[in-house]
Amino acid sequence: MVPKVLVMSGYGINCETETAHAFQKAGAETDIVHINDLIAGKKKMADYEIIMFPGGFSYGDDTGSGNAFANKIKNNLFDDLKEFINSGKLILGICNGFQVMTNLGLFALPSTDYGERISALEANTNNRYECRWVHVKENDSICVFTKGITITHVPIAHGEGRFYCDEKTYFELKENKQIVFSYCDSEGNSANQEYPLNPNGAYYDIAGICDKTGRIMGLMPHPERSLYSISEPEYQLKKEIAKRNREIIPEFIESNLQIFKNAVEYFNK
């Protein structure tokens, strides 16, 4: 089947188009929907297979990144969202979307239920907005979005991306293989919570996590902004090296596109 993706929009979300494009390149159908149309009943979550919370600055990050948008969902759509989760479908959140999902409590542990917040995404330790490329490695997690991915090169753009949770939660995440991505160097060596490899001071270098089923993932980096090789900062150098070696640079950064392909393939097992 061709899954349909509900790409959330409204109130400062600004990555809808490139996120929809990523899913389309992976073979999905997409529908960019304003949150008010869901609240008004013009569109229904149940009509989709994947819900996507894109990046941006919802409500200008007032009251904390992702908090106001999460409250709007809690107050109007949370029952629909829980039904969507219980039906076995997928949810993905990138950057501000990860922040929204964190505030909603969507990253349930084996010991918790949906709606219970287990972690936070706090201000970067250097108190600066970080906008550049980083490397992250996949931690052999249970996440359905990341099968076949090891290390990938991907951009970040955030001021509040420092993952934090208490020790008990961290060890439960680790034991259940819910820590999906960690910041690293180009060879996959741990960032050891050191800048600049870890851009925000994230606890144990955590860049992305999933829920206890592996069907709900959030991450701070932006794979939807880095589908194409031409977008990499080193593209011109790589192009020249490839030319001299009579090689061709692949059109896509496959490890980033794979996230969206895995979501589509999940519904075609």
Swiss-Prot record:
Main localization, broad class: cytoplasm
Protein name in UniProt: Phosphoribosylformylglycinamidine synthase subunit PurQ
Pathway: Purine metabolism; IMP biosynthesis via de novo pathway; 5-amino-1-(5-phospho-D-ribosyl)imidazole from N(2)-formyl-N(1)-(5-phospho-D-ribosyl)glycinamide: step 1/2
Cellular localisation: Cytoplasm
InterPro entries: Class_I_gatase-like, PRibForGlyAmidine_synth_PurQ
Upper classification of the organism: Archaea, Methanobacteriati, Methanobacteriota, Methanomada group, Methanococci
Gene Ontology biological-process entries: 'de novo' IMP biosynthetic process
Glutamine amidotransferase type-1 domain span: 5-262
Gene: purQ
Keyword set, alphabetical order: ATP-binding, Cytoplasm, Glutamine amidotransferase, Hydrolase, Ligase, Nucleotide-binding, Purine biosynthesis
EC number(s) from the headed UniProt entry: 6.3.5.3, 3.5.1.2
HAMAP family the record matches: PurQ
Catalytic residues of the enzyme: 95, 222, 224, 232
